[in-house]
């Protein structure tokens, strides 16, 4: 399922996104965020994070740098004790 979601995002990036002006207020773009979130967390949690990110994309949100959160195992591995 995750690969199917990534395929849908890639389809959007390649064929639909070029038809409209660049409007993403975030870095990375919402579509790149979605791909990274799905790869890192899987289809369900990654899809949920992507949906939350897209819902933040409106004129009243300042935007800016909004990276995909680290997975808990990655955070534990890099934690300094």
UniProtKB/Swiss-Prot annotation:
> Does the entry feature the keyword Cell membrane, yes or no?
yes
Cellular component per GO?
A: plasma membrane
Tell whether Cell membrane is among the UniProt keywords: yes
Q: Tell me, what's a Pfam family for it?
A: YidD
| Entry keywords, A to Z | Cell membrane, Membrane
Its record classes its membrane topology as: Peripheral membrane protein
Q: Which InterPro entries match?
A: Membr_insert_effic_factor_YidD (IPR002696)
Subcellular localization is given as: Cell membrane
Functional description taken from the UniProt entry: Could be involved in insertion of integral membrane proteins into the membrane.
Q: Which HAMAP family match?
A: UPF0161_YidD
Family statement: Belongs to the UPF0161 family.
Name of the molecule in the record: Putative membrane protein insertion efficiency factor
């Amino acid at each position: 399922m995750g690969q199917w979601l990534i395929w849908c995002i890639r389809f959007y990036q390649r064929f639909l996104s070029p038809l409209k002006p660049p409007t993403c207020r975030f870095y990375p773009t919402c579509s790149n965020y979605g791909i990274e979130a799905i790869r890192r967390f899987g289809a369900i949690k990654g899809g949920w994070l992507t949906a939350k990110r897209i819902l933040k994309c409106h004129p009243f949100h300042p935007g800016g740098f909004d990276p995909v959160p680290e997975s808990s195992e990655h955070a534990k591995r890099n934690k300094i004790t």
